[in-house]
Amino acid sequence: MSFGRDMELEHFDERDKAQRYSRGSRVNGLPSPTHSAHCSFYRTRTLQTLSSEKKAKKVRFYRNGDRYFKGIVYAISPDRFRSFEALLADLTRTLSDNVNLPQGVRTIYTIDGLKKISSLDQLVEGESYVCGSIEPFKKLEYTKNVNPNWSVNVKTTSASRAVSSLATAKGSPSEVRENKDFIRPKLVTIIRSGVKPRKAVRILLNKKTAHSFEQVLTDITDAIKLDSGVVKRLYTLDGKQVMCLQDFFGDDDIFIACGPEKFRYQDDFLLDESECRVVKSTSYTKIASSSRRSTTKSPGPSRRSKSPASTSSVNGTPGSQLSTPRSGKSPSPSPTSPGSLRKQRSSQHGGSSTSLASTKVCSSMDENDGPGEEVSEEGFQIPATITERYKVGRTIGDGNFAVVKECVERSTAREYALKIIKKSKCRGKEHMIQNEVSILRRVKHPNIVLLIEEMDVPTELYLVMELVKGGDLFDAITSTNKYTERDASGMLYNLASAIKYLHSLNIVHRDIKPENLLVYEHQDGSKSLKLGDFGLATIVDGPLYTVCGTPTYVAPEIIAETGYGLKVDIWAAGVITYILLCGFPPFRGSGDDQEVLFDQILMGQVDFPSPYWDNVSDSAKELITMMLLVDVDQRFSAVQVLEHPWVNDDGLPENEHQLSVAGKIKKHFNTGPKPNSTAAGVSVIATTALDKERQVFRRRRNQDVRSRYKAQPAPPELNSESEDYSPSSSETVRSPNSPF
C-alpha cells in the first residue's frame, strides 16, 4: 500500500464525470464512499420503462442472527433511496441499537446467505433479505421468526407461543393464559450476571406488562442487554431457576439474568454494597439475608464464564439512567423501528401494553473481566470479550496516554487498531476522554475514521478503531510525480463531505489539518480521505469561546474570542485547499513569533502570488476566497462548498497543468520520512484529547482584536467542554481563559 514514486492521484477524481456533459444524468443518487464514476442513465426510454423504474419494490428485511425479529417491510423506490448507501443508512437507523447490529447495517444478504446485495437493482419485489454488519451470515429460518405480543388485544395461539418459547415452562402456555389470577402489580429487580459491578434494571410486572413468560424474557433481554445474546435463564438469589411466569410472583423480588453461557460466576448470587443500595429503596425482605450469606448454591460449576460477559456499574440512584449509549445511533429511532414501537407503547399506561425495557433503573459503561484474558507486554489485562473476537498483536503506536496495538478480527481477518487508554493517567480529566468517545460513537461516515467497538474496564478503556494505512494528506502529495487541480478538487470533495456530515449533527471538529486527513485505499484501487482525531470535537448548542486548534488553520473568530460555531471548520478547509494548490499556507508568521500570523488571520487578506498561482484556475481562487471570509455569515457552508463548480467538476479547466507543490510542502511543513505508510494512521489513533493540553500558545492582549467583529459580551465562564489548552506554530492547542 506504500506510495511509490510513480503513483498517480487520478483516483481522487471520484465524482460523476458524466455530469460535466449531461447535467441531468446523476439520477442514481449520492456518490459511493469512494465517489467512483457512475455511468450515465440518461438515454432514450419509453414512458413504460420510466414508470416501472419509479415503481416501489416492497421487500422485507431481517436482522442477521436475530431469531426473534419478524422483519420490517420497506418500499424501495428511486425517489426514496437515491443510492444503495442511502438505503444502508436508513436501515441502520431502523434496525441498529446497542444489542442488535451495534456497528450499523453494512451488508445485505439474500435470505439464504449465498449472495450479497450491492445495488438497489438487485432487490426483487416481494423477496426477503438479511441485514448484517461485519459479522458472517448466520443461517436461520428468518421467515419463521415470531415476536411476543405487544398488545393485550392480540390473541395468541398456544402453537405460536410454543414456537417462540425461550425456556421450558411448567405447564402449557394455554394453561397459563387461562389462569392469570396470580398476576398482581409487582416491582422486581433484574441483575445481569458476570463480574462486579453489575448492571441492574427495575421492572414493573402487572397484567398489562406480563402476558407470558416468553414475552417477559424478551423484554428483560431488551432492558438488560446481555452481550452474549438473549436472556436464556433467570435465577433467584437462592439459585432456583425461574421456570414460568408464576415464579415471578412468588416471594423473590431479585433475579439474576443469564445468557447462553454454560458456567456461572461463583459470587453471582451475592450482592455487594452498591447493588444493595440500588434495591434497598424498595424494601426487599431478602436483601439483608442475602448479603449475610457466606455461601450460595450455584446452578453450575464454580468457574469463570468462558463467554463474553460485559458488566456495568450499579448506582444507588433509583430511576436515573447514568450512561450514554455505546452505539452512535440516532437518538430518535425511525417510527418503523421495533425499538421506537416499544417506546411508544411504554408511554401509554392507560390501556395498551407497556414495554419492560422502559423501566431501566441505571446503567454505566460496560466493564469486562474473565478467563481467556491476555496480559500484554505493557501489563494490560486485555478482556476476554476482546480476545475472543480479535487477535491482538504487537504494539504499533505509543502516545502519552494511549497505546495502539495490532488487532485482527478472527471471523473476517480484517485489520483494525486497538487503542488502550490507561485510566490512571487520566485522573481528573476523564470527562475529556468521555467527550471524545461519545462523539466517535455518534459518527459514521465513509470519510471519517470509525470507532468499531469499545470496552470499558476498571483500569483501561479499549477502543477498536478503523486502521487507515495509506499515510496522511501530505504523504499522498509528496510521494507522487503527477498532481493536478482535479486531484486537489477530489480531496476537498472528501473533506467537505465529512464536514457536511458532522455539521448536520451539530458537531464541530476544531482541528482539521493535513495530519488528521488519512488516505484510505479501497478494494477497487480507488482512494479517498478520512478525517480522524476528534480530541477537540464538541457539540455546538451555542457560541463557543474556547481558544483551540492549530495556529496555521485557526479561524479569526476563535482568536478574537467573540464566539464561534461550525464554520471554523470551513476556514480550516479553505487553508488546506490553498496549501493543496500552491504548497504553502495563506497566512504565515515569522519564526516563533505568532503575533504576525494571528494579525494576518484577523485581517483575512488572501493573496495569490505569482508565479505560484499563475496556472491555477480562477474558479479555485474564487472558492478559496469564499471559504476564507472573515465575515462568518458570508463564509461558505459545507453544502455550498460541495455545490461549487470547482468541486463538482463543472469549473475544472479542460487542459490541466501539473502542480509542483511537493517541494514547497516539504519546505514549509514538517514532512520527514515515516517508517511506513501506516505510521500516520497510528499516530492519529494514539492521540487523545489529553494530548492537546501539552502545548501552550499565547499572545499579548490586543485591545483592537475585536474591533472588526460585532461587540459581544464575554461569557461569565467557559462551558464544561473547554478544558483549556494550547501550542506551537503547527501543533494542536487550547488556551486558558485569557490566552493572549
From Swiss-Prot:
One of its GO terms (biological process) is axon extension. GO terms for molecular function: ATP binding; protein kinase activity; protein serine kinase activity; protein serine/threonine kinase activity. Residues 347-362 have a biased composition (Polar residues). Residues 287-378, 697-740 are annotated as: Disordered. GO terms for cellular component: cytoplasm; plasma membrane. Residues 390-647 form the Protein kinase domain. SMART domains: DCX (SM00537), S_TKc (SM00220). ATP binds at residues 396-404, 419. The modification Phosphoserine is found at residues 32, 36, 305, 307, 330, 332, 334, 337, 347, 352-353, 355, 364, 376, 726, 735, 738. In fetal tissues, highly expressed in brain, detectable in lung and liver, but not in kidney. In adult tissues, expressed ubiquitously in the brain, detectable in the heart, liver, spleen, thymus, prostate, testis, ovary, small intestine and colon. The type A isoforms seem to be expressed predominantly in fetal brain whereas type B isoforms are expressed abundantly in both fetal and adult brain. It comes from the Eukaryota. Its EC number is 2.7.11.1. Residues 697-707 have a biased composition (Basic and acidic residues). Signal peptide: none annotated. It catalyses: L-seryl-[protein] + ATP = O-phospho-L-seryl-[protein] + ADP + H(+); L-threonyl-[protein] + ATP = O-phospho-L-threonyl-[protein] + ADP + H(+). Changing residue 291 to F: In a gastric adenocarcinoma sample; somatic mutation. Induction: Up-regulated in response to enterovirus 71 (EV71) infection (at protein level). Residues 57-143, 186-269 form the Doublecortin domain. Residues 366-377 have a biased composition (Acidic residues). The active site is at residue 511. Keywords: ATP-binding, Developmental protein, Differentiation, Kinase, Neurogenesis, Nucleotide-binding, Phosphoprotein, Repeat, Serine/threonine-protein kinase, Transferase. Probable kinase that may be involved in a calcium-signaling pathway controlling neuronal migration in the developing brain. May also participate in functions of the mature nervous system. Belongs to the protein kinase superfamily. CAMK Ser/Thr protein kinase family. CaMK subfamily. This is Serine/threonine-protein kinase DCLK1. It comes from Homo sapiens. The gene is DCLK1.
